[in-house]
Regions:
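Alpha-helical transmembrane segments of polytopic integral membrane proteins
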Residues: 27, 31, 66, 72-75, ...
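N-terminal signal-anchor module of multipass membrane proteins
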Residues: 3-58, 62
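Long, contiguous internal "core" modules enriched in hydrophobic/ aromatic residues
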Residues: 6, 13, 18-23, 40, ...
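Membrane helical hairpin/interfacial module
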Residues: 34, 45-103
Length: 183
């Protein structure tokens, strides 16, 4: 195959920044959601660590999402993207990304009130994990569905995005677990 016919991806810095930060934030929310939904009740100051991780993930996701506006042609019209959620992966990603902040904030309030082990906290945490997974999958589908970029139209795109989010979100989770075990 002729080299001239191969199209390479040359994403803008804002796309890389968005993908990295938001992926890490949503990945951390996925891990936290799974840990709280299916793990043992928090002990000692563990709930405080979870609160800090929830906030850290929220900041990473929010900054990443704001970075996504940098590569829009007309950022002031970004709100219109939400109206196309039935047909657009970009719109679905936006709706789900914003929806993730609702259970994250609710979980933060439950943990702050000392209710980190009750059924409500576990249900909200499970919802956060599911919404986080769905958001990352929608992000991947944006690139997997772009016909002009053949590199994105590969069966490994969605699993790759999910794996990247879980790995980058898992790093702060592992660090926190290390501090918890040492303390």
């Amino acid at each position: 195959q002729c080299r001239a016919s191969v199209r390479r991806m040359n994403p803008a810095f804002s796309v890389i920044f968005f993908t990295t930060l938001s992926g890490a934030g949503f990945g951390l929310w996925i891990w936290l959601g799974l840990r709280i939904a299916f793990g043992a009740a928090p002990r000692d100051f563990q709930a405080l660590g979870w609160i800090l991780l929830l906030v850290f993930a929220g900041i990473a996701a929010a900054v990443g999402l704001l970075a996504s506006f940098w590569h829009l042609g007309k950022p002031l019209r970004a709100w219109r993207a939400f109206s196309q959620w039935r047909t657009s992966w970009l719109s679905r990603e936006g709706v789900l990304a914003l929806a993730c902040f609702v259970p994250a904030f609710a979980l933060l309030l439950l943990l702050a009130a000392g209710d980190g082990s009750d059924a409500m906290a576990r249900a909200v945490a499970g919802l956060l994990a599911l919404l986080g997974l769905a958001t990352v999958a929608c992000t991947a589908m944006i690139y997997a569905s772009l016909a002009p970029i053949p590199a994105g139209r590969h069966r490994a795109t969605v699993p790759g995005y999910l794996l990247f989010a879980l790995l980058t979100g898992g790093l702060p989770m592992l660090l926190a677990a290390g501090f918890d075990a040492a303390g």
